[in-house]
Every structure is written in C-alpha cells, then in structure tokens.
Amino acid sequence: MGNRGMEELIPLVNKLQDAFSSIGQSCHLDLPQIAVVGGQSAGKSSVLENFVGRDFLPRGSGIVTRRPLILQLIFSKTEYAEFLHCKSRKFTDFEEVRQEIEAETDRVTGTNKGISPVPINLRIYSPHVLNLTLIDLPGITKVPVGDQPQDIEYQIKDMILQFISRESSLILAVTPANMDLANSDALKLAKEVDPQGLRTIGVITKLDLMDEGTDARDVLENKLLPLRRGYIGVVNRSQKDIEGKKDIRTALAAERKFFLSHPAYRHIADRMGTPHLQKTLNQQLTNHIRESLPALRSKLQSQLLSLEKEVEEYKNFRPDDPTRKTKALLQMVQQFGVDFEKRIEGSGDQVDTLELSGGARINRIFHERFPFELVKMEFDEKDLRREISYAIKNIHGVRTGLFTPDLAFEAIVKKQVVKLKEPCLKCVDLVIQELINTVRQCTSKLSSYPRLREETERIVTTYIREREGRTKDQILLLIDIEQSYINTNHEDFIGFANAQQRSTQLNKKRAVPNQVIRRGWLTINNISLMKGGSKEYWFVLTAESLSWYKDEEEKEKKYMLPLDNLKIRDVEKGFMSNKHVFAIFNTEQRNVYKDLRQIELACDSQEDVDSWKASFLRAGVYPEKDQAENEDGAQENTFSMDPQLERQVETIRNLVDSYVAIINKSIRDLMPKTIMHLMINNTKAFIHYELLAYLYSSADQSSLMEESADQAQRRDDMLRMYHALKEALNIIGDISTSTVSTPVPPPVDDTWIQNTSSHSPTPQRRPVSSVHPPGRPPAVRGPTPGPPLIPVPVGPASFSAPPIPSRPGPHPGVFANNDPFSAPPQIPSRPARIPPGIPPGVPSRRPPAAPSRPTIIRPAEPSLLD
C-alpha cells in the first residue's frame, strides 16, 4: 500500500473525527472523507458490504437509508464493529449491526420513513478491509412512498449536498450499468458541487445485468462519457445470491473471474473490481487528506487559541487528574488575589476600555466626590455669620466687649470641624461599596464553583466590614485630634492682623476669571424639543461663565452663560431615559437661555452628575435647596448689627475661613492615606496571605469545589476538547513531509453531464468500438461501428482525445479508412474481441494483416482485411 506514513493519515482522521464527534464538533471541521451517492437500488449497499466482507446494512423496498452512515473501516487482526453512541459494546454478529442501525435510525427519525441529517458513526475492524472512511447517504428518490413527505426528494438532495459540498470530501458516484448514465442524478449532484471533477470518482455497478450483446467498455475506459478520475466497474451479488446466503468472499472471487473472462473487460481487469476500488479510494483519500492537512491544522490552531482563553486556569491539568480540585482551588484563589490587586492598583495588560475599574472609581471618590462633599459645607455664609455674632454676644454677656474674643473663634472652629465627620464617613462608605463591587467582579471567574464563590465573597466582605469599623474609628480620631487643639501658630494661618485687613475687602476673593475648571460633553434636554429632541454639546466651565460649543475643537461657540445668580437643582430622571439630569436656573427669575427659565443638562451616569456639581461648586454655583435654607435663616436675622460687632464678625469669619481651610487641606490629604492603609492595603494582604486558610477552615475542600451538573459537564467537555485539539495538532505535526502524492488526472470534457439532451438514452451501451480519422471531429460524419484495426497501447493521449458522441444500437458497418496510423490512441492494450474458438492465452498483439476477430454479437463475421 505504499508509504506507511501515508497509510497512517486515514486512522488519524478517524481519531480526530471521533474526538470531535464526542463533543458535538464533528460538523464544524471538514474532515476528509468519501461520500457515497447514488439512486435507490443503485448498488450502494452492496459496494459497501463488499468493502467490509459482511452483510450488515439494512435492505428493503423504498427508502431504507434515512440517516447518513459514517463508516470507518480499520484494518485489524480481529473482526468486530463499534457504534459511537454505544462504545462499550462490541458487535461480532453483523446481523445485530443491521438491527442496531435500524433501531438507531428509528430512534431519531421515527417509523414514518422520514429522514435526518444526524449521522450514525460506525467503526468496523476487520482483517479484510483497507483503511477507509465513507459516508453512506440516502438514495435519491423522486416519488414519495407511503407516509413519506411530499418534498422527500428535496430533503434528500439537501442532505446529500450538505455532505458533498465540503471541499474536503471525495464523492463516490454510484450508477448501475443498466441505467442511462447521462441522466445519472449522482453525477449531476457531483457536477453541481465539483465542476472541475477533482473530487468525483465514478463507480459502475451491475455490469453483469446489461443486455446481451452490449457492454460498458467505452465508459470504463473513460472515453465515451469521461470523468476526470474515471470509472471503476464492480459486480455485486444479485438479490438471488443474497437470499441464497452467497458468501461475499465467494462473490469477490466470482467478480474477479467475470472481469478476467469477459472479452470486453479482460484487458482492464487489473483496474476493475472491488479490490481495485478499495485501493483507489484509499489512495485518493490519502492524497486528499495530505492536501487538506494545512487547512485542517490552521482550523485546529484557531479553535485552540479561542479555547485557551476559556480554559486559561485549567489548561495545565486534565479532568481525570486526582489532584485537580486542589490545584484548581489554589490557582483560583491566587488568580482572585491577582485580579483584585490589578483592579485596585491598575495594570497595563488587559485594560478595560468600557468602564472604570475599582481603583479608578476609588480615585474619583478621593479626589472628586470627597472634595465635593467638603465644598458643600463651606458656602453656608449667612448661617456662619449669625453663629459668629451669637458666639461673640454670648461670650461678652452683660458686658460690652472692646476686643474680638478668641473664644468665639475657637467655638466656631470646633463646630465647623465636627461637621467634617459626615463627609468623611460618607467617603468611607463609598470606598467600601466599591471594594465589595470589585470583589464580586473578581469572583465571577469562580462561577463554576458556586460554593467557593459564595464563601470567598462572604469571607472577604466580612473582613472589609471589620476594617470599616477600624477605619471609621481612626478617621473620627483624626477629627477629634483636630478639634482638641486649635493651632493659631500654623504657618498658613492668617492671624488677627491679616484678618482685620482682609475684613475691609468683604471676602471678594474669587478664582482667576479665565481659569478653566472643567470641560466635557453634556446633553441639553430641553433646548431642541421642537427640533427633534435633545442635542449634545461640548461644555467649558470657567470661574465666570459656562460656554458650549459644537465640538471639542471649541471653534464654533453656541452660547456663553455668565455664572452670576445661577443655582443648581436636581431633576428627576425621565421614565424612558437612561440619562441622569440636573438643571441650572437664575435666582432672579430671569430666562437663562432665550425663552427658557432653566437649562436641563444630562449625563450618562450619576457619577458624572456629581462630578459636574462639584465643578460648579468650585465656580461658586451652589445647589438650590441649601440656598433656600440660607434664605430662611436670613429672614430670622433681619436685625441690624452695630459697626463694631460687624467688624468683629468679619474678623472671626476670616479667621475661621483660614483655619477651616487648613483643616480641610489636612483632612483631604489624610483621608485617602488612612483608607488605603487601614482598609485597601490590609484587604489585599488578607486575600494574598490569609484567605486560603479561612477557606479551608470554613469548609472542607470537597464541598468548596462542588460544581453544578451543568457547569461540571461544560467544564469537562471544554477541557476534553482542549486536550483533543492539542493531541490532534501534535499528531499532525509528526507527519512525514516526504510523503509523495499521486498526481491528479488531467481535465476532461465533462459537459455531457449538464447537456444530456444531445446524447442517446443508452450512451454506455457499446456494441462495437469505432475509430475516427485524424483531424476530423466526431460530428463531421456519422459513427461507423466495427472492430478496431489495430489495438493501441494505453497512453496519456487517451485523456486528451475529444469525447466520442453517443450512438444508437448496434448495426453493421465498415471503416472508410483502414490506415492503422490514422486512428487516435485507444485505451485497450489488447484486441477488444476474441473469437469463441481462441483460448484466453492468445497473444494480445497481431500484425496489421492478421484477420480481425468477430464481435460477440456476430461471432462468425469475417474480417474486412481478409
């Protein structure tokens, strides 16, 4: 059978096919195989049974094969059969194989003669077969029988096309010799998907059932109706032989005797019969597999790469590894710690571009949300002045004070410091929420183990809650420390002298007018209601104005809105809107923009809204509700202050403002540090060094690594497929590159398959061969049946000769030209006819003057050259 490495290619495909069929991936890989196509009663079952040497396929009238049968023939010293759907059972009785095929077919298709594209996988081991992989497809039928659906013809054709359309499949087109070959549905379907004829092999059956006096010699020699890969003739058992229990091996011997003894086929007997068909198919399949290996390897590598992402944490061990659970637990806990640290600290690899990570969100809390909460408590100007005036008066009592009391300053400062507790504790709560969300995101990879995920989240969350208490205690301690001693000697404190000088300026300190506080996209909800809805603009917020532009290039300014008398109010989110909205309005009831009393600005998230509010606060635009409270307080303090008290209030006001700014600066600096040290860093250390111990102490390993049935099945299938892919790639990589392929035959003119109307009803019937003069096409003159003058050896030129047109039945005739050199090359290497009296051992070549032998039809007819 040639190179041993080439023969091992076909078992390789069988191994790959089983590996992927077991996990439902067989149809996704175009594994090289041979598809057997033919009409009903064309002899497909007999051909397949001759391969195996056993009777095992269902037989009967009508459509019998209703599901594709993937038949893998494997050379083995022992003979048995295996089905993929019941691998544990070996069939040694082939009658049971037939019954199992029928039962498995009925299990899927029912008993109403329906069909199904789901294949039946059957492997047959035998010392009498070559390594072949074939697919037996349902026979082509025209008319439904019994309960078959009306579109049974189209269903079968669709199923056949589904298998033979693959570029990696060879097509075995089976046609009986007693049927019109030009109208063969098998060849037509093969031509439809394989117009070049590279994948089609013709098989002619029932040669022994042709009408007396006719033969298929021209067809088998690939001269009359040529195919690129030619035809192979076989002789199967008749129904009488099958009923008479004629042994297949005996039938193969009878087939061999038929070709050796038949006058029309004996010169090509070595290229006919089931054994030669086996060898030819094995050779063609081996060549095809070798050509398909690069694409197959590429597909396997592509699937392996996509699968590696899913089994990253499991790829180093197999499902049957006894230490798999321990390895998985250790690896998952370690990976959880790495993922948590990356989400908090940030990482350059696998950066999420869709949303902010936990660390980025915590950073926004530290530097945007927390300062925003601090700024909100700084603007209560009227309440602060009222409290200062009350403190001064209460300290003086019945006396009239001449100097500004420093006790009033300390009392007001301590009261302001106490107000820092609320935003500080709120900051801790926000960070805790982000930490818990980060933990849940990192445990998503543990979804295969619900118990492990639940315990991990519980243990880490409990630890975070424990650190929450210590962190809040430490922050309250910091505030108490600030409150315990007022350090008026601080280098940043303005002192009484500077406070009195600054009191004459009436606190006119403002930001730099042209300083840009924030830029970004915002949607104006109510500016284009009459023009089709909201519109997005590029906004620029400075210390004095709010401007918006068409785009971020800031070339086309739409409008500039001064910040004087502007306030912010919250707007309820619309029922059908995903945006978060806040509004800007004028406190003096003036239109803000054109005829609008307020402008509604929308953001994608509440975080963006809070960030924009903090920016407006820095620009001096405050929320509405706080301003309303201030106005209520102002109504209660309509009393007039004397000039001396007013100067004292202003002085203490400036002192308080200066000292509170120092405290705020200190708190803004210490809050992130305290939270990082006591909560975040400790949580990271706990996950790395203590989480595993807590997991082992909370439950045993078996309960932690329990999987749901679906998750376990999916995981095992994924790992099995991953290792099957790696094994397949390793096997393909070991194939010898020195394998020599059999060259593909040259192209032939096979247009006869499409244009069948120009041929006779029985094109394969050949009474006597005819020879045409050189240089003249067959269509110039009618055919002149008769024996050839000189047999010409087989040569490549026989494939390049123009196809001989079909001709009517036999009739006597003579050649117009008897020049032996004028005839084109012929396929046979010996005379086509032997007289009855000449024994089989007569030499195959005779001189031109020798008398020609009569044909089978006219055995007594003398040669014209006598």
Swiss-Prot record:
Post-translational modification: Phosphorylation at Ser-844 by GSK3-alpha relieves the inhibition of BIN1 and promotes endocytosis. Phosphorylation at Ser-760 by CDK1 is greatly increased upon mitotic entry. It regulates cytokinesis downstream of calcineurin, and does not affect clathrin-mediated endocytosis. Dephosphorylated by calcineurin/PP2 during cytokinesis in a Ca(2+)- and calmodulin-dependent manner. Phosphorylated on tyrosine residues by EGFR and after activation of SRC.
The species this protein was found in: Bos taurus
Dynamin-type G domain residues: 28-294
Subcellular location: Cytoplasm, Cytoskeleton; Cytoplasmic vesicle, Clathrin-coated vesicle; Cell projection, Uropodium; Endosome
Source organism phylogeny: Eukaryota, Metazoa, Chordata, Craniata, Vertebrata
Domain PH: 515-621
Membrane topology per record: Peripheral membrane protein
EC numbers on record: 3.6.5.5
Name of protein: Dynamin-2
Top EC class of this enzyme: hydrolase
